[in-house]
């Protein structure tokens, strides 16, 4: 039995209605974009299964589904950098989420010790494609 209501066949109800009916993909996951609630910086992109989303809503602490480890993941549980959810939004067809969070502890979100997982810029110049690394890694991982 699902914690969330089934999506109706009426597209308008999904796109304009007030009922939260997240649409999980064939693997049972929904994409979650995570930004810092203070300044809007993009911190990470992750995935949630139904249990992770339910726990996030119940506790106010972000939980995700680790595809690589195949298990539930309470972000920051080991490092102390827990993500407190300030606001949660869904997109027009309810198949993606946007979490605005406050990060506890000393602040890094990425397992590399950086604040954001998006620290590399893809640079295309003169037919060459490379990565430009922004910001040093301040923490051991």
Swiss-Prot record:
E.C. code: 3.5.4.19
GO terms of biological process kind: L-histidine biosynthetic process
GO MF annotation, one: zinc ion binding
Pfam families, per the entry: PRA-CH
Catalyzed reactions per annotation: 1-(5-phospho-beta-D-ribosyl)-5'-AMP + H2O = 1-(5-phospho-beta-D-ribosyl)-5-[(5-phospho-beta-D-ribosylamino)methylideneamino]imidazole-4-carboxamide
Biological or metabolic pathway of the protein: Amino-acid biosynthesis; L-histidine biosynthesis; L-histidine from 5-phospho-alpha-D-ribose 1-diphosphate: step 3/9
Cofactor annotation: Mg(2+); Zn(2+)
Subcellular localization, as worded in the UniProt entry: Cytoplasm
SUPFAM superfamilies: HisI-like
Any Gene Ontology CC annotation: cytoplasm
Positions with a binding annotation for Mg(2+): 91, 93, 95
Keyword terms: Amino-acid biosynthesis, Cytoplasm, Histidine biosynthesis, Hydrolase, Magnesium, Metal-binding, Zinc
Cofactor annotation remark: Binds 1 Mg(2+) ion per subunit.
Residues that coordinate or bind Zn(2+): 92, 110, 117
Keyword Metal-binding: yes
InterPro entries on file: PRA-CH, PRib_AMP_CycHydrolase_dom, PRib_AMP_CycHydrolase_sf
Superkingdom assignment: Bacteria
Keyword Metal-binding on entry: yes
Family: Belongs to the PRA-CH family.
Database matches in HAMAP family: HisI
SUBUNIT field: Homodimer.
Entry function: Catalyzes the hydrolysis of the adenine ring of phosphoribosyl-AMP.
Name by which UniProt lists this protein: Phosphoribosyl-AMP cyclohydrolase
Source organism of this protein record: Brucella anthropi (strain ATCC 49188 / DSM 6882 / CCUG 24695 / JCM 21032 / LMG 3331 / NBRC 15819 / NCTC 12168 / Alc 37)
């Amino acid at each position: 039995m699902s914690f969330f209501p089934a999506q109706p066949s009426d597209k308008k109800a999904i796109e304009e209605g007030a009922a939260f009916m997240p649409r999980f993909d064939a693997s049972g996951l929904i994409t979650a974009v995570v930004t810092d609630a203070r300044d809007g910086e993009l911190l990470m992109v992750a995935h949630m299964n139904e249990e992770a989303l339910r726990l996030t809503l119940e506790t106010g602490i972000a939980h995700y589904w680790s595809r690589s480890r195949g298990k539930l993941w309470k972000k920051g549980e080991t490092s102390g950098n827990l993500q407190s959810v300030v606001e949660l939004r869904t997109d027009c067809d309810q198949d993606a989420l946007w979490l605005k969070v406050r990060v506890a502890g000393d602040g890094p979100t990425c397992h590399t010790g950086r604040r954001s997982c998006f620290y590399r810029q893809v640079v295309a110049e003169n037919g060459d494609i490379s990565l430009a690394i922004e910001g040093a890694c301040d923490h051991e991982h």
